[in-house]
Amino acid sequence: MLMMLSLLCLAGCQREAADDDVAELSGKIFVFNYRVAQATYLVTLRRLRPLPEGGVVEASFEDPRGGPPLTVQQRLFPVMEKIVLESPPVHCVKKGKPYGVAIRLLDPQGDERQTIETTIASNVDQDVLPAKPLSLGPAYDRNPEVFRLDGSTEFSPENCPT
């Protein structure tokens, strides 16, 4: 009986916290773009409440290669229904390993309105991508470093520690 009462109180606290939320996580994935030989994190948030005019969303993505987190910042506008956050290119993503993402929604004064923490795990290793882009430029010209004049190809993956 005491356990049931504790669970009800805990559930009530969770609803209260959610009532103040400005946005919720609606999607997260690694994007592997073979054409440009890049991988990025892609996170989407769905707006729950009006966004603060002049506010900012800041996301920090764990660097799969190690080192400090990769951070992006984006202005918020009241008309936004969803917020899309994409990391700078990342390297050495490993299949099944959860990588951390921390998101902060800030009001115009820089005060934190909400934080969201999550992880993203890829279902493939980054070695599915070649180390060099397959095409160059807006016309998708073949990259001569990959498609050589002698007819051979170079699809080797990027060198990453194991």
Which residue ranges define each predicted feature?
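Bacterial N-terminal signal peptides that target proteins for export
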Residues: M1-M3
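Bacterial lipoprotein signal-peptidase II cleavage site
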Residues: Q14-D20
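Contiguous beta-strand segments within globular domains
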Residues: L25-R47, P52
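Short, solvent-exposed, Trp/other aromatic-anchored flexible loops in extracytoplasmic proteins
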Residues: V79-R113
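Short beta-strand elements
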Residues: D111-T162
